[in-house]
Amino acid sequence: MRFQQFLFAFFIFIMSLLLISGQRPVNLTMRRKLRKHNCLQRRCMPLHSRVPFP
């Protein structure tokens, strides 16, 4: 019974760490590259500004 409680507390702790780390960007340059959509190519940015879809 005590082992199950420990396992449950450990599981909750790991899940909270994953949620917290998932909200922050790994580095700010990646965040700048990804601007409004998830495309990493440079030539894609002007194309996306001219077409009606993201």
UniProtKB/Swiss-Prot annotation:
The species this protein was found in: Homo sapiens
CDD domains xrefs: Toddler
Protein name: Apelin receptor early endogenous ligand
Quaternary organization: Interacts with APLNR.
Signal peptide (residue range): 1-22
Gene Ontology MF annotations: apelin receptor binding; hormone activity
Main location: secreted
Disulphide bridges, residue numbers: none
Listed GO biological process terms: adult heart development; angiogenesis; apelin receptor signaling pathway; cell migration involved in mesendoderm migration; coronary vasculature development; embryonic heart tube development; endoderm development; G protein-coupled receptor signaling pathway
Keywords: Angiogenesis, Developmental protein, Differentiation, Gastrulation, Glycoprotein, Hormone, Secreted, Signal
Family note: Belongs to the Elabela/Toddler family.
Gene Ontology CC terms: extracellular region; extracellular space
Task of the protein: Peptide hormone that functions as endogenous ligand for the G-protein-coupled apelin receptor (APLNR/APJ), that plays a role in the regulation of normal cardiovascular function and fluid homeostasis. Functions as a balanced agonist activating both G(i) protein pathway and beta-arrestin pathway of APLNR. Downstream G proteins activation, apelin can inhibit cAMP production and activate key intracellular effectors such as ERKs. On the other hand, APLNR activation induces beta-arrestin recruitment to the membrane leading to desensitization and internalization of the receptor.
Pfam families: Toddler (PF22050)
Glycosylation sites per record: N27
Upper lineage: Eukaryota, Metazoa, Chordata, Craniata, Vertebrata
Location in or out of the cell: Secreted; Secreted, Extracellular space
Superkingdom of source: Eukaryota
Tissue: Expressed in the intima of blood vessels. Expressed in endothelial cells in blood vessels in the heart and lung. Expressed in cytotrophoblasts and syncytiotrophoblasts of first-trimester placental tissue and term placentas (at protein level). Not detected in smooth muscle cells or cardiomyocytes (at protein level). Expressed in kidney. Expressed in blood vessels. Expressed in embryonic (ESCs) and induced (iPSCs) pluripotent stem cells. Most highly expressed in undifferentiated embryonic stem cell and is rapidly down-regulated during differentiation.
